């Protein structure tokens, strides 16, 4: 994904810079708007490979996940969530936040490749 458009592009660039491949392969890169577009490039045969989130790669069983990028080669990936405000008016939002932090939802996230 394009580092100017998508977080996945930023993480990909960090990995490629850390391995020394960013500059040596720069003229061969094709940037997609996002991870889904990158996966579609691979599915359509327009590119040979793409760097995508494992969670997205797992949604395309016909594609081969070739390798996992080492975690120490890019910034930590997080998906923040927040409930704005408090009180009775926002009880549903607070309940949802508690649900997201529950062990049950952690198991569901892990089953889809999130850690």
Model-derived features with residue positions:
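Exported/periplasmic ABC-transporter solute-binding proteins
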Residues: 1-115
């Amino acid at each position: 994904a394009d580092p100017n458009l998508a977080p996945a592009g930023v993480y990909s660039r960090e990995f490629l810079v850390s391995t020394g491949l960013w500059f040596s392969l720069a003229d061969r890169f094709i940037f997609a708007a996002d991870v889904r577009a990158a996966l579609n490039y691979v599915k359509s045969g327009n590119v040979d490979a793409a760097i995508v989130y494992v969670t997205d790669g797992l949604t395309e069983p016909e594609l081969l996940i070739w390798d996992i990028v080492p975690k120490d080669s890019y910034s930590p990936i997080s998906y923040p969530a927040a409930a704005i405000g408090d009180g009775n008016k926002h009880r549903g939002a607070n309940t949802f936040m508690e649900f997201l932090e529950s062990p049950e939802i952690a198991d569901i996230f892990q089953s889809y490749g999130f850690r």
